């Protein structure tokens, strides 16, 4: 019976790296000493041997390959994209012995022998340019892991033998998305250590000079530059933290240089930016009538700070109460303070989201997105007969349907030819306060895209009242009233910062009770 260990002995004991055959069969705690304590205690010290572990399949195949070909690894072509990793072979169109300087896998990894075999690949410049970097990513991952140390021992004179002229197409995944993901993983593994020349890092962008010039070329610099350039430019969706070499910035085509000069030229940049003059929604409505117009014409930046200043000026004027008694005037001031506190709650988030923008280009992109969404929402409003108003997050109206214009007695020019806020159409202070409370609930954090509410919209004070005598009942009540109460549904469209960019409100009038009108 095994001796029961004390708690102190249990804490002090350490598991052995490999058990002996006796302890392994009896499931005993073995020690690192040979013979171990259990075998000495049972007088079988001469039989204490390390247990033979079952070898994995890939190690068995590697051992067989080592016995069959002491200097080379046989190369297979397989249609399965996983064959290079599972079978221990590397896909290629050639079955010749490979040089360790070429970055390919050979048996030097297993035998630790330094054997140099000349490369059989010809120096074909056109085929090197056509080589696809995607095809050699599997080889790169293996070679990077196995031969980083051996690559530093290769003389620079043998660097011309490092790039094969033909690449196998068997290592490509059938799915483009899976293949791109595999490339990203390969880039991460390859960049985890200092860069060493490998086939795919030099096959796509490298051009080998003529033979008489090979002695004067520093291939280490060439391979470092081409590897950095390939990983940065061929797959820009992943950032590997490369710094910009000064010579890479000069390798631009003439067209790229002209475009860059136009962007960086201050005189050209002034044409992209816009002046502080206000451009009404009626003007932009005529400029951007279709999606093609958005990309064909210059985008007019929208000045959100100016719009917020105009909104503040309107609110102060609306809640001033100059001609009201002191009690009502104080109530107006209290309502204004409530609104300003609601605006101040989400204002810092809006400012911080736009601080990191590259002005004016990011602002142009946001405005282009806004105009593109506005066209879609206007088409949507034309498909239904609900009275519709579309406004920005500042509250400025950018689109209004004919149905609500006829209900409220306004014209299109009177609304869109100047800066008109949705709050200007609201009849009472309660509707305005309720608007800002609802907007605060969706401005930050809450990503709900729809809101259901009630509000009162004011009719045009200068509307035609000549039809008052000819109307009776419900129509007369709607005509004589200075406002119409609506049930409204807001649909919130957000920008790339998840901030409300565009709000489409659909308004259904609440008919007064009486004269046979059923009220729910």
From Swiss-Prot:
Residues 74-85 have a biased composition (Low complexity). Residues 63-104, 194-213 are annotated as: Disordered. Residues 376-445 form the PAS domain. It comes from the Eukaryota. One of its GO terms (cellular component) is nucleus. It is found in: Nucleus. Residues 20-48 bind DNA. Residues 90-104 have a biased composition (Polar residues). The keyword Heme does not apply. One of its GO terms (molecular function) is RNA polymerase II transcription regulatory region sequence-specific DNA binding. One of its GO terms (biological process) is cellular response to starvation. Belongs to the ERT1/acuK family. Transcription factor which regulates nonfermentable carbon utilization. This is Glucose starvation modulator protein 1. It comes from Meyerozyma guilliermondii (strain ATCC 6260 / CBS 566 / DSM 6381 / JCM 1539 / NBRC 10279 / NRRL Y-324). The gene is GSM1.
């Amino acid at each position: 019976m095994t001796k029961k260990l004390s708690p102190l002995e249990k804490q002090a004991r350490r598991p052995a790296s490999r058990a002996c055959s006796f302890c392994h069969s009896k499931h005993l705690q073995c020690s690192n000493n040979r013979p171990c304590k259990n075998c000495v205690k049972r007088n079988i010290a001469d039989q204490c041997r390390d247990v033979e572990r079952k070898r994995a399949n890939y190690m068995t195949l590697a051992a067989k390959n080592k016995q069959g070909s002491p200097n080379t690894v046989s190369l297979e072509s397989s249609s399965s994209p996983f064959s290079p990793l599972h079978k221990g072979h590397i896909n290629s169109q050639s079955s010749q012995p490979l040089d360790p300087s070429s970055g390919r896998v050979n048996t030097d990894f297993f035998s630790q022998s330094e054997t140099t075999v000349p490369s059989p690949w010809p120096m074909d410049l056109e085929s090197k340019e056509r080589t696809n970097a995607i095809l050699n990513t599997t080889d790169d991952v293996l070679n990077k892991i196995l031969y980083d140390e051996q690559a530093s021992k290769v003389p620079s004179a043998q660097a011309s033998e490092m790039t094969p002229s033909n690449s196998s197409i068997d290592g490509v995944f059938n799915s483009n998305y899976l293949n791109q993901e595999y490339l990203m993983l390969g880039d991460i593994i390859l960049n985890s250590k200092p860069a060493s020349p490998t086939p795919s890092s030099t096959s796509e962008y490298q051009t080998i000079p003529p033979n008489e010039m090979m002695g004067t070329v520093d291939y280490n610099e060439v391979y470092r530059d081409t590897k950095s350039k390939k990983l940065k430019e061929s797959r820009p969706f992943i950032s590997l933290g490369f710094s910009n070499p000064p010579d890479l910035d000069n390798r631009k085509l003439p067209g790229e240089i002209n475009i860059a000069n136009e962007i960086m030229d201050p005189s050209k940049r002034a044409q992209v930016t816009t002046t502080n003059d206000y451009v009404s929604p009626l003007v932009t409505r005529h400029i951007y009538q279709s999606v093609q117009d958005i990309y064909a014409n210059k985008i007019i930046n929208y000045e959100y700070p100016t719009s917020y200043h105009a909104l503040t000026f309107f609110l102060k004027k609306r809640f001033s109460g100059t001609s009201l008694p002191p009690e009502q005037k104080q109530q107006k001031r209290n309502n204004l303070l409530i609104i300003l506190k609601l605006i101040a709650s989400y204002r810092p988030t809006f400012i911080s989201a736009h601080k990191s923008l590259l002005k004016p280009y990011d602002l142009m992109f946001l405005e282009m997105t806004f105009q593109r969404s506005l066209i879609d929402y206007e088409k949507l409003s034309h498909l239904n007969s609900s009275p519709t108003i579309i406004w920005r997050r500042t509250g400025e109206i950018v689109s209004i349907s004919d149905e609500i214009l006829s209900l409220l007695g306004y014209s299109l020019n009177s609304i869109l030819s100047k800066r008109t806020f949705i709050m200007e159409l609201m009849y009472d202070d309660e509707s305005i306060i309720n608007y800002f409370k609802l907007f605060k609930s969706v401005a930050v954090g809450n990503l709900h895209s729809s809101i259901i509410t009630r509000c009162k919209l004011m009719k045009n004070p200068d509307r035609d009242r000549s039809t008052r005598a000819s109307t009776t009942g419900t129509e007369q009540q709607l005509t004589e009233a200075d406002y119409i109460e609506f049930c409204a549904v807001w649909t919130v469209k957000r920008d790339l910062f998840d901030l409300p960019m565009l709000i489409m409100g659909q308004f259904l009038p609440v008919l007064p009770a009486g004269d046979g009108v059923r009220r729910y």
